[in-house]
Regions:
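Compositional signal for N-terminal targeting/processing segments
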Residues: 1-179
Length: 179
């Protein structure tokens, strides 16, 4: 018979009711080769995300703000563009928005485009280590500015007692407010 080492109790939702709540969902995208196994895993992932969000909304309150990286539009136009960026995630966002949430733009278009361009450049091999190092430093600096901008936009729009949903890559480096 195994011995129980300890028990971690789930905290009640009560203390969080009047605080800002941000649910973070790592974005997973369709595999490039449309492999059946990969698609099945992806479907299961998004189904579990929907289930967890529904459960958390019942305890913590309705999601009022939806934030998605790489998205530069709000409303119906934002949802349509999201279908191109993240087809699986867009279905979730559509349901949440139909229940009253708003899509909030968190990206600065110039910083987003700069980071995407630099990322493409860094995929190429370089003859000069100096050029590679300079581009890497530029890219990291741009990412730092981009993530700081995302953090400030969330901080501006998510008010006390509200819940928001952030869909972002799992390797993000956004630093959130301490509350």
């Amino acid at each position: 018979m195994t011995q129980e080492l300890g028990r971690i109790e789930r905290p009640s939702a009560g203390p969080f009711q009047e605080k800002r709540k941000l649910l973070l969902v790592p974005c997973l995208y369709q595999p490039p080769d449309n492999a059946e196994e990969g698609l099945a895993i992806l479907d299961r992932y998004w189904s579990q995300v929907r289930s967890q969000i529904n459960s958390l909304e019942m305890k913590l309150g309705q999601i009022l703000h939806v934030y998605h990286e790489n998205l530069l539009d709000t409303g119906d136009e934002g949802v349509q563009k999201l279908e191109l960026l993240n087809a699986e995630g867009s279905a979730l966002v559509r349901v949440i928005c139909s229940a009253g949430a708003n899509i909030e733009v968190i990206e600065d278009e110039e910083l987003l485009n700069e980071s995407l361009d630099l990322q493409r450049c860094l995929m190429m091999p370089f003859m000069s280590q100096k050029v590679g190092t300079s581009l890497q430093e530029w890219f990291l600096n741009t990412l730092h500015k981009r993530y700081a901008h995302i953090s400030s936009k969330i901080d501006e729009t998510l008010k006390e007692g509200e819940a928001g949903l952030l869909l972002i890559s799992e390797r993000h480096q956004v630093q959130f407010a301490s509350d």
